[in-house]
């Protein structure tokens, strides 16, 4: 099992990129993976289930994730430091990933 750049046993996975990214996508994707991994160590994820799981399972995932994307996008640059604004963008992307996961699981 790979966890973005590493196998589960913490053996490095060889990452070779022949693409000359113009917008630092490779660096940003690595940072995004580190951010997402860090959210799994936060206090609200220490329980057996996260609140997000209940929301998705109850059929409210699309509204929840899109609502959070809008919330953090509108908050961008208006709260805290420049680094706080950057974290808001990471949250937008993370909720976008959860929205994609939910979209793929829905059977509409």
Q: For the regions a protein language model found, what residue spans apply to each?
A:
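Intrinsically disordered, low-complexity regulatory regions
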Residues: 1-108
């Amino acid at each position: 099992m790979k966890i973005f750049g590493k196998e589960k046993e913490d053996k490095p996975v060889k990452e070779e990129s022949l693409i000359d990214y113009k917008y630092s996508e490779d660096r940003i994707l690595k940072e995004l993976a580190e951010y997402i991994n860090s959210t799994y160590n936060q206090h609200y994820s220490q329980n057996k289930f996260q609140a997000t799981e209940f929301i998705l399972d109850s059929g409210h995932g699309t509204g929840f994730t899109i609502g959070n994307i809008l919330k953090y996008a509108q908050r961008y640059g208006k709260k805290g430091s420049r680094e706080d604004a950057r974290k808001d963008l990471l949250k937008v992307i993370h909720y976008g990933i959860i929205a994609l996961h939910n979209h793929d699981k829905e059977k509409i």
